[in-house]
Amino acid sequence: LSIRRQRQMCIRDSFYTLHRGLYDIAETRLNTILVDLNAEWFKSMFGEGPENTIVVASLCNGPGNYAFNGITKGEKRGIVIGCSTDKEGNPAYSRFLITVIVHELLHHYTNPCLAQYWSQIDSASQIIYPHVKEKMAKLAYGSTNSTMIEWFNNLLTIMYFKDNPNRGFTATHLTAWRQHEGFIWMERSMTFMEHFRNHRNLYSTIKDFMPEIVSFVNYTASDFDNVLKEYDNKEPYITDIFPISNSILPLGIDTIQIRFSKPMFGAYGIRPLDDKRISPPYTDYQPFWKDKYTFCIILDRSKLEKGKTYGFKLNRAFFQSEKTYPMKEDFPYTFKMPDE
C-alpha cells in the first residue's frame, strides 16, 4: 500500500470506530429489510445468487444508493444504501427500501446482459430515446445508454416483485410508476416477459432469453408511434359530470356525480382551490364510489349560503385507474348556489 492509501485507511477506520454505535443501529435496521430478500430468485433468473455481493450501510451519502464493482480482481462487488434519520437522529429505513435494494442488486446482473447485446439494440435505442429524453433528464439519465440500462433494470425489478409480492406495492403499481416516469413502454415490456415466464423449459435464465429481448426492443422502436398513443390513453379522464362545473346548482340536487373514462382504483383526494375567495362545500357526508367509474360527493345544502360560489379540486395523484395510472392533472370544480 502507498503512504496515501495507508493514511486514507487509517482515517476511515478511526471514523468508523468513533461512530460504531450508529453503524450498529444502521446494520440492525437494514438487516430487518434484507431478511425478506429472496436470494434464490436471482439464482433462478440469472444462474447466480447474490451471495458474493456486499451491502454497505452508508451514513455519509445521504439517501443516495448505487451499485459498485470491486476495483481489483478478487474484490467483492456490492451496493451502497443511504439512509434518512429518525427523530432521535439515528439511521432509519423505509420498508419500501426493499425496492431500491432489489434494483441496485440487479444492476450487477442486468448491466452485463445488456452490454453484451448493445450493438444489436443501439439503433433502436436511438429511435426511442428522443421521445423520452426530457423525462429521462429529470431522472438524471442523460444518454441513450443510461436510459436503456435503467429500463432493463427496472423491468427485472418489477418482475422480482411480481414473483415476490410485497405489502404496500404491487407489480402493477410499479409498472405504472415507471411508465409515468418516462419508461412508457414498460407495460408492453412486462407483457412480453410473460413469454419468458411461460417457456422456462426453453429459457433457463434471462441470458438465454436475451435474443428475444433484442427483438422486442427493435420491434418496439419500429412501433413507437403506437406506444405513444397507448400511453396517452392510459391516464383516466372525466367523461361526464353533473352538475356541470361553473354552473348554478339546480334546486333539488345535492350530489355531484363524476364519471371517469376507465375503471378506477377506488381512492380519492379532494383539496381546496388555490383561489382563497372560493370556499370548499364543507359537509358531514363522506364521498363515495357509486361504482368503478362514478365518484359521488354529497352536499349539505343547509350549510351552503345563497348566491355564494363554492369549489374544490380533485387531486390527480389520488384518482387512479385500476392499473394505478393517475389523472394527467388536477381537476378544478366550482358551482354557485342559487340566489333564491
Regions found by a protein language model. Name each.
Residues 19-75, 268, 273:
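Auxiliary, metal-adjacent structural segments of Zn-dependent hydrolase domains
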Residues 24-32, 88, 96, 138-144, ...:
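Second-shell loop/turn segments in exported
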Residues 65-95:
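Active-site scaffold of zinc-dependent metalloenzymes
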Residues 95-116:
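Active-site recognition of the HExxH zinc-binding catalytic motif
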Residues 113-180:
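Post-HExxH zinc-binding segment in Zn-dependent metallohydrolases
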Residues 157-239:
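Pan-zinc metallopeptidase signature
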Residues 230-340:
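Acidic, low-complexity Ser/Thr/Gly/Pro-rich repeat segments typical of extracellular/periplasmic
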